[in-house]
């Protein structure tokens, strides 16, 4: 046996009974005569490239002794066995399950990466049902929407409300001692007896019943400007 790293040694291939207890036993396959050779490698030649001569066909083989997997235990522990029996091949069903399992794992990893890229706010949950991998996307619980108070819409006051408000102010200005209830009743009567206000008619076109209203109500209240009721002691309001 010779080495290519500036060191050389020679040893023929002998049966395992002739090997030293300090040497390491490895096997070499001769591709010329298709023979497996048991070679004793000294500890100094480990992890080196050595030359082995086949004892069957005298062919020279160049072997790199650098793989621990090719080394067998020492000869003293080996006994009379030449090579350990190879492990039995796995059943075909197991191979198919391993292959399909590897494919499922790769597909699941790709789908998980794809889902996480497109749905950053969602969790990908893997479940197995009847031997099949199923993907479930569960959305993150979203925070409840903030309860905003309803916006109050400002309504435009109607013509009636504007008239009543202004009329109450006018009546109270003429008679500060009058109650708000009496002023409101007088303002309502003025609105009822002058229908031209409802239709937006000008004050220059008074209705024909204006004179009659003044005559009928002259005794019950004091007349104001434009025939409106002013403040008076008797405004036709029933007191409880």
UniProtKB/Swiss-Prot annotation:
From the Swiss-Prot or TrEMBL record, state where the protein is found.
Nucleus
User: Could you cite one Gene Ontology molecular function of this protein?
Assistant: zinc ion binding
Q: Does the keyword Nucleus apply?
A: yes
Q: Could you tell me the keywords of this UniProt record? A: Developmental protein, DNA-binding, Metal-binding, Nucleus, Zinc, Zinc-finger
Please provide an example of a Pfam family that matches this protein in its UniProt record: YABBY_N
Instruction: Note down the stretches annotated as region Disordered.
Output: 135-156
GO BP of this protein: abaxial cell fate specification; fruit development; polarity specification of adaxial/abaxial axis; regulation of DNA-templated transcription; regulation of leaf development; regulation of shoot apical meristem development
Zinc finger (C4-type) in chain: 30-57
The entry summarizes the disruption phenotype as follows: Leaves polarity and growth defects.
Cysteine disulfide partners in this protein: none
The record's annotation in InterPro entries points to:
HMG_box_dom_sf, YABBY, YABBY_C, YABBY_N
GO annotations of cellular component type: nucleus
Tissue-by-tissue expression: Expressed in abaxial regions of lateral aerial organ primordia leading to cotyledons, leaves, flower meristems, sepals, petals, stamen and carpels, but not in roots.
Q: How does it assemble?
A: Interacts with SPL/NZZ. Interacts with SPEAR2. Binds to LUG and LUH; these complexes promote adaxial cell identity in leaves as well as embryonic shoot apical meristem (SAM) initiation and postembryonic SAM maintenance.
Q: What does this protein do?
A: Involved in the abaxial cell fate determination during embryogenesis and organogenesis. Regulates the initiation of embryonic shoot apical meristem (SAM) development. Contributes to the repression of KNOX genes (STM, KNAT1/BP and KNAT2) to avoid ectopic meristems. Binds DNA without sequence specificity.
Q: PANTHER family per the record?
A: AXIAL REGULATOR YABBY 3, PROTEIN YABBY 6-RELATED
Describe the family membership recorded for this protein in Swiss-Prot or TrEMBL.
Answer: Belongs to the YABBY family.
The name of this protein is Axial regulator YABBY 3
């Amino acid at each position: 046996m010779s080495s290519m790293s500036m060191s050389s040694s020679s040893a023929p291939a002998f049966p395992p009974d002739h090997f030293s207890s300090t040497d390491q036993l490895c096997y070499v396959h001769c591709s010329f005569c298709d023979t497996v050779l048991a070679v004793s490698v000294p500890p100094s030649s480990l992890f080196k490239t050595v030359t082995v001569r086949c004892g069957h066909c005298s062919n020279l083989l160049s072997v790199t002794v650098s793989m621990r997997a090719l080394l067998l235990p020492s000869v003293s522990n080996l006994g009379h066995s030449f090579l350990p029996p190879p492990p039995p091949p796995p059943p075909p069903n197991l191979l198919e399950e391993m292959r399909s399992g590897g494919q499922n794992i790769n597909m699941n990893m790709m789908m998980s990466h794809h889902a996480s890229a497109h749905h950053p706010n969602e969790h990908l949950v893997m479940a197995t049902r009847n031997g099949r991998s199923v993907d479930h996307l569960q959305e993150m619980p979203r925070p409840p929407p903030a309860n905003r108070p309803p916006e109050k819409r400002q309504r435009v006051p109607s013509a009636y409300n504007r008239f009543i408000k202004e009329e109450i102010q006018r009546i109270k200005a003429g008679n500060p001692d009058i109650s708000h209830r009496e002023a409101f009743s007088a303002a309502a009567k003025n609105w009822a007896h002058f229908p031209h206000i409802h239709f937006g008619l000008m004050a220059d076109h008074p209705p024909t019943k204006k004179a009659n209203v003044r005559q009928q109500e002259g005794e019950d209240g004091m007349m104001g400007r434009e025939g409106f009721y002013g403040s008076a002691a008797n405004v036709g309001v029933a007191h409880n």
